[in-house]
Amino acid sequence: TNGMLIDEDVIDFADRQMSNVVLSLDGRKEIHDRLRVDYKGNGSYDAIVPKFKRLVESRGGKDYYIRGTFTHANPDFTKDVFHMADLGFTQLSMEPVVAAEGDPAALTSEDIEIVKQQYEILAQDMLRRQREGRPITFYHYMLDLEHGPCIYKRISGCGSGTEYMAVTPWGELYPCHQFVGDEKYSMGDIWKGVTNKEVQDEFKCCNAYAREGCKDCWAKLYCSGGCAANAYHATGSITGIYEYGCDLFKKRIECAIMMKVSEASE
């Protein structure tokens, strides 16, 4: 949720019915308000942060994530992660933007190098916070080296289009929310079920071994071939290679492994 319509009824419903809640916040006020605006064009930071604090406080330990997107405007995204932590939030995620080449928000090759450095800064700071007894969780560094996903899950990934689908308010079915509105990937509706079997079959074959460039990659069983939607929007094919995404994913896994090694040696 972007938070604008959160009230006590929403908070109560989320506490009773939702095992996890994802709250959209891009970090520092000036960063968040660049793109997250209300219908009048005003930034939403001041309106939503108090609501997010109230919702998180009410959950009493249930899962939540404060989740943001960083763009060309803030490749120094760790400042935004630390800002969220300073607000009192401890379960955090920041995702790189996926945008068409030439889009003002798109990450450049120069940005990618900055972002890689930022991932290292974040990992080191998380270790420091952990030693000080005030840990934070960063979604992309959650790595279980002993009891991780089964091999089927490692190969198939998120299961979009096969194990789950997105349902629009009008009852239409799509492989996931990022394909909503693209009629090529309309799968059917809740009344008739899945009628476009070709799309479902296409997604069944979208896995860690479907991409030629993944076959010799050391990280393929961590990413399961990556996000089909990101690949599609970047290359035009759900089995394409979104190279920026690959580079950043591998850097995140490197940092997550480094943290595990550091924790084991302490």
Regions found by a protein language model. Give the residues of each.
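Radical SAM enzyme core and accessory elements
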Residues: 170-172, 209-266
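Flexible glycine/acidic-rich beta-alpha junction loops that bind and position SAM and/or redox cofactors
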Residues: 30-35, 91-113, 135-149, 178-186
